[in-house]
């Protein structure tokens, strides 16, 4: 009885080819693609092209009746000098910006709203950004002549009223931490991207947060902050800076495909030359 082992051997051969190709992709081509694109990204966009400034590094003035104001001075850094990054340590720090450069501001606001009444959970949060210290908390309409409002918007938020409470079912469902329940039910998240422009010639920037209804208290989450991004003339660089993670996925995929094509062409060329060499050696023999 003859046993045909050609099929299992052929299957084993092709399986080994697939495993080798997968290992080359995983251990050589993919890391090489990541390194090449990372170097390409840093050449186009230096590490100091953006800076995340937490709101807890601003000077803060609170007023339940009149809102909360965050203001900080700007320090212009000349070209050729390293641009420092803001340290998230809760201490007031000047905002470093490259001299003669326009910036775009991305706001990431996370906050709780407490109501002193037992009704009206829904409210509007008024957001104003000023060039300068901005208005006094007691007189929102009376700003300094040097101040310039460069952005305004209103966003709906949910406020925690006096009669609101957490049920045992909610606590059991979301975990033993009551703060997790508050995060799930009452944490308001507002993101505003690519709508605010700021020049490094400004001396001060201030962000003014106020609810339409007076009897509210805002509690700012420590993750809140403002991302300062350099505004380049090339739209592609701005997009890469805004969507860094997405640009890495696309860029690495492109370089991965290019390297795979080069590997394939090189492998086919080497295979053809080897076959020709074998054929010539057979003819001579």
From Swiss-Prot:
Sorted keywords for this record are: Endoplasmic reticulum, Lipid metabolism, Membrane, Transmembrane, Transmembrane helix
Give compartment(s): Endoplasmic reticulum membrane
Keyword Chaperone among UniProt keywords: no
One biological process GO term for this chain? lipid metabolic process
The membrane spanning regions, by residue number, are: 17-37, 245-265
Cytoplasmic-side stretches of the chain, per the record, are 1-16, 266-285
Lumenal face: residue ranges? Answer: 38-244
Q: Which CDD domains match?
A: Seipin_Sei1_like
Keyword Lipid metabolism in annotation:
yes
Induction description: By calcium shortage.
Gene Ontology molecular function terms on file: identical protein binding
What does the record say about its membrane topology?
Multi-pass membrane protein
Q: One GO term of the cellular component aspect?
A: endoplasmic reticulum membrane
User: According to its UniProt record, where is this protein mainly located?
Assistant: endoplasmic reticulum
Describe the inactivation phenotype: Produces supersized LDs that are up to 50 times the volume of those in wild-type cells.
Comment field (misc)? Present with 846 molecules/cell in log phase SD medium.
According to its UniProt entry, the function of this protein is described as: Involved in lipid metabolism and lipid droplet (LD) morphology, number, and size. Facilitates initiation of LD formation, and ensures that vectorial budding of LDs from the ER is directed towards the cytoplasm.
Family named by the database record: Belongs to the seipin family.
Protein name per its UniProtKB record: Seipin
Originating organism: Saccharomyces cerevisiae (strain ATCC 204508 / S288c) (Baker's yeast)
Question: Which classification does the entry list for the species?
Answer: Eukaryota, Fungi, Dikarya, Ascomycota, Saccharomycotina
- GN (gene name): SEI1
């Amino acid at each position: 009885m003859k046993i045909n082992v050609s099929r299992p051997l052929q299957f084993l051969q092709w399986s080994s080819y697939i495993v080798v190709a997968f290992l080359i992709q995983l251990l050589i081509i993919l890391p090489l693609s990541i390194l090449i694109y990372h170097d390409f990204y840093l050449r186009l966009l230096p590490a100091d092209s953006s800076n995340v400034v937490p709101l807890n590094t601003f000077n803060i003035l609170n007023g339940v009746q009149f809102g909360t104001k965050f203001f900080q001075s700007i320090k212009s850094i000349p070209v050729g000098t390293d641009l420092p990054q803001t340290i998230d340590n809760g201490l007031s720090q000047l905002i470093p910006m490259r001299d003669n450069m326009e910036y775009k501001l991305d706001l990431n606001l996370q906050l709780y709203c407490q109501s002193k009444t037992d009704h009206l959970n829904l409210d509007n949060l008024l957001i104003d950004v000023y060039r300068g210290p901005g208005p006094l908390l007691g007189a929102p309409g009376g700003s300094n002549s040097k101040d310039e409002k460069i952005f305004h918007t209103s966003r709906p938020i949910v406020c925690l009223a006096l009669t609101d409470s957490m049920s045992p079912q909610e606590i059991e469902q979301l975990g033993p931490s009551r703060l997790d329940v508050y995060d799930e039910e009452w944490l308001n998240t507002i993101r505003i991207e690519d709508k605010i422009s700021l020049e490094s010639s400004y001396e001060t920037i201030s962000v003014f947060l106020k609810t339409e209804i007076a009897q509210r208290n805002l509690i700012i989450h420590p993750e809140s902050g403002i991302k300062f991004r350099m505004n380049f003339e090339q739209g592609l660089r701005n997009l890469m800076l805004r969507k860094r993670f997405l640009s890495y996925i696309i860029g690495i995929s492109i370089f991965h495909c290019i390297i795979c094509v080069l590997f394939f062409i090189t492998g086919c060329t080497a295979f053809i030359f080897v076959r020709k060499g074998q054929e010539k050696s057979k003819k001579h023999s």
